[in-house]
Amino acid sequence: LDYRWMPYKRISTNLKKALIASEDARFAGHGGFDWGGIQNAIRRNRNSGKVKAGGSTISQQLAKNLFLNESRSYIRKGEEAAITAMMEAVTDKDRIFELYLNSIEWHYGVFGAEAASRYFYQIPAAKLTKQQAAKLTARVPAPLYYADHPKSKRLRNKTNIVLRR
């Protein structure tokens, strides 16, 4: 288990930009819920007949990561919404982002951006290049899948998508 806390001010600008672009482009302007993103996810899921898109914001992901489990149910989504609303009411965006970045798993037992940066690149997270930040960010939706498939075409494609945003 590797975990190292990184204060918001010391987080790489490249990583901040990559994560916002990839996970929640409207993060700074919403109150915890991206209604347009949720509508798009519902539409994509309905059209495909499967759950392919989540529509969760960084705030919602943080609520789930800190307080809930991975189950996919309406009850869990309701709990996530309530926790997200409470967090957004009492916590500023920088702190939410800091908590999120320090709580997500990037690889088996590797938690937080600092630990991930040192694990994958042997450098502090503050020194991540744009390419390195994009590749780390590409892992966020499925870190354990990419742990088992580090050279997958999916990871390369996702990295390129993050770089273009």
UniProtKB/Swiss-Prot annotation:
Superkingdom of origin: Bacteria
Pfam families: Transgly (PF00912)
Catalysed reaction, written as an equation: [GlcNAc-(1->4)-Mur2Ac(oyl-L-Ala-gamma-D-Glu-L-Lys-D-Ala-D-Ala)](n)-di-trans,octa-cis-undecaprenyl diphosphate + beta-D-GlcNAc-(1->4)-Mur2Ac(oyl-L-Ala-gamma-D-Glu-L-Lys-D-Ala-D-Ala)-di-trans,octa-cis-undecaprenyl diphosphate = [GlcNAc-(1->4)-Mur2Ac(oyl-L-Ala-gamma-D-Glu-L-Lys-D-Ala-D-Ala)](n+1)-di-trans,octa-cis-undecaprenyl diphosphate + di-trans,octa-cis-undecaprenyl diphosphate + H(+)
UniProt GO BP: cell wall organization; peptidoglycan biosynthetic process; regulation of cell shape
Metabolic or biological pathway: Cell wall biogenesis; peptidoglycan biosynthesis
Compartment(s) of residence: Cell inner membrane
Key words, A-Z: Cell inner membrane, Cell membrane, Cell shape, Cell wall biogenesis/degradation, Glycosyltransferase, Membrane, Peptidoglycan synthesis, Transferase, Transmembrane, Transmembrane helix
Principal EC category: transferase
GO MF entries: pentosyltransferase activity; peptidoglycan glycosyltransferase activity
SUPFAM superfamilies, sorted: Lysozyme-like
GO cellular component: peptidoglycan-based cell wall; plasma membrane
Entry's EC annotation: 2.4.99.28
Protein's membrane topology: Single-pass membrane protein
Effect recorded for residue 129 to S: In allele 7, allele 8, allele 9, allele 10, allele 11 and allele 14
Entry similarity comment: Belongs to the glycosyltransferase 51 family.
Job description of the protein: Peptidoglycan polymerase that catalyzes glycan chain elongation from lipid-linked precursors.
UniProt-recorded name of the protein: Biosynthetic peptidoglycan transglycosylase
